[in-house]
Swiss-Prot record:
GO terms for cellular component: endosome membrane; late endosome membrane; lysosomal membrane. This is Probable proton-coupled zinc antiporter SLC30A4. The modification Phosphoserine is found at S36. It comes from Mus musculus (Mouse). InterPro entries: Cation_efflux, Cation_efflux_TMD_sf, CDF/SLC30A. It catalyses: Zn(2+)(in) + 2 H(+)(out) = Zn(2+)(out) + 2 H(+)(in). Its main location: membrane. Residues 135-143, 200-216, 297-311 are lumenal. It is linked to Defect in Slc30a4 is the cause of the lethal milk (lm) phenotype. Mice with lm are defective in zinc transport into breast milk, due to a premature translation termination codon at position 297. Only homozygous mutant adults develop dermatitis, skin lesions, and hair loss due to a systemic zinc deficiency. Pups of any genotype suckled on homozygous mutant female also develop symptoms characteristic of nutritional zinc deficiency, including dermatitis, alopecia and stunted growth. Residues 240-265 are annotated as: Zinc binding. The keyword Transport applies.
Length: 430
């Protein structure tokens, strides 16, 4: 019987074979101490093909490695291998850092535009008040009042952007988003007080007609107002940006509760678009004041045009501020935002796999544009182990598809309801 020495000699003869040792399914994994380091000089645990020249490499891939790869461990990292179709089909959502960086960049640009617009509004509003006082024109002052509403809206938007960066405290765990709502109420009340004063003066002028208007000052002020509002329109106009179509096919395009149409308008902002719409309204009003000033300048006997413009512009101010009041009331009463449909959201949640029922769904707004949801769902019997997957899908649906700011999802396994009879109700019914 051969001893251990014969076995060692046999293995050493096998190691002297010129055939390279590759890592494949048929190779033996023998890492015993009996083999010296010289015997393993051509083996590296990180290499797929161990060969010093191309002649030793096989013509077919071994263990998924390309035969033309260099005999260097780092070559696998340096080469750009083509991705397969399955790898290309994977679409990863951007990480939180990327989303935050993109949001900060967008907010910075929005703040710059709105700050410039607010400064221009403030300067010209003061100029209109001075010009209206010098011309003794209520129409000019009413136009300045309308500009005050637009200035208040821009200031509230800037306040909301500033508050969004503030962290919640132990006292105010939701943050300070509702401060925007409080500021909106105060600004609207101030506008209504000033509008009431101007309407009272307009009625007195209509009745008594004992006033004179400086047509020259009124005409110059109105002309400057038209020019300023044209500048504001160009400043706040966003129609010249490039469209980046990024359609989401999670929901049908005719969904009644889609937050956006699927277009990503670059640095497009609802706040800037709202300010642009207000600027267009101011432009129309300024043109009306300019026409009235032209009439009064060349036909002083038609000075009744001044209080008439005050009546018309007061209605315009009331119409533009009514939406602010309504949105404020809905937020305070914790109503569902107008752009969301509770029934459609519930149907979308029910379409998630392994969801048995949506027991409760509450949606409200912390402030304008920041919706919050709490949902309670039951899972179908036997699917309790999939709760993480269901929770992830529901969270993605609420945050990404419907644009929620925050959401809380409660899941529980299916439990058949047990009908319980209250003793008091039973006794009263009998």
């Amino acid at each position: 019987m051969a001893g251990p020495g014969a076995w060692k000699r046999l293995k050493s003869l096998l190691r002297k074979d010129d055939t390279p040792l590759f890592l494949n399914d048929t190779s033996a994994f023998d890492f015993s101490d009996e083999v010296s380091d010289e015997g393993l000089s051509r083996f590296n645990k990180l290499r797929v093909v161990v060969a010093d020249d191309d002649s030793e490499a096989p013509e077919r891939p071994v263990n998924g490695a390309h035969p033309a790869l260099q005999a260097d461990d780092d070559s696998l990292l340096d080469q750009d291998l083509p991705l397969t179709n399955s790898q290309l089909s994977l679409k990863m959502d951007p990480c939180d850092n990327c989303s935050k960086r993109r949001e900060l960049l967008k907010q910075r640009k929005v703040k710059t535009r709105l700050t410039i617009a607010a400064v221009l509004y403030l300067l010209f509003m003061i100029g209109e008040l001075v010009g209206g006082y010098m011309a003794n024109s209520l129409a000019i002052m009413t136009d300045a009042l309308h500009m005050l509403t637009d200035l208040s809206a821009i200031i509230l938007t800037l306040l909301a952007l500033w508050l969004s960066s503030k962290s919640p405290t132990r006292r105010f765990t939701f943050g300070f988003h509702r401060l925007e709502v409080l500021s909106a109420m105060i600004s609207v009340m101030l506008v209504y007080v000033l509008m009431g004063f101007l309407l009272y003066e307009a009625v007195q002028r209509t009745i008594h007609m004992n006033y004179e208007i400086n047509g020259d000052v009124m005409l110059i002020t109105a002309a400057v107002g038209v020019a300023v509002n044209v500048i504001m329109g160009f400043l706040l106009n966003q129609s010249g940006h490039h469209h980046s179509h990024a359609h989401s096919h999670s929901l049908p395009s005719n969904s009644p509760s889609m937050v956006s149409s699927g277009h990503n308008h670059g640095q497009d902002s609802l706040a800037v678009r709202a300010a642009f719409v207000h600027a267009l309204g101011d432009l129309v009003q300024s043109v009306g004041v300019l026409i009235a000033a032209y009439i009064i300048r060349f036909k002083p006997e038609y000075k009744i045009a001044d209080p008439i413009c005050t009546y018309i512009f007061s209605l315009l101010v009331a119409f533009t501020t009514f939406r602010i009041i309504w949105d404020t009331v809905v937020i305070i009463l914790e109503g569902v935002p107008s752009h969301l449909n509770v029934d459609y959201i519930k149907e979308s949640l029910m379409k998630i796999e392994d969801v048995y029922s949506v027991e409760d769904l509450n949606i409200w707004s912390l402030t304008s544009g920041k919706s919050t949801a709490i949902v309670h769902m039951q899972l179908i019997p036997g699917s309790s182990s999939k709760w993480e997957e269901v929770q992830s899908k529901a969270k993605h649906l609420l945050l990404n598809t419907f644009g929620m700011y925050k959401c809380t999802i409660q899941l529980q396994s299916y439990r058949q309801e047990v009908i319980r009879t209250c003793a008091n109700c039973h006794s009263s019914s009998t």
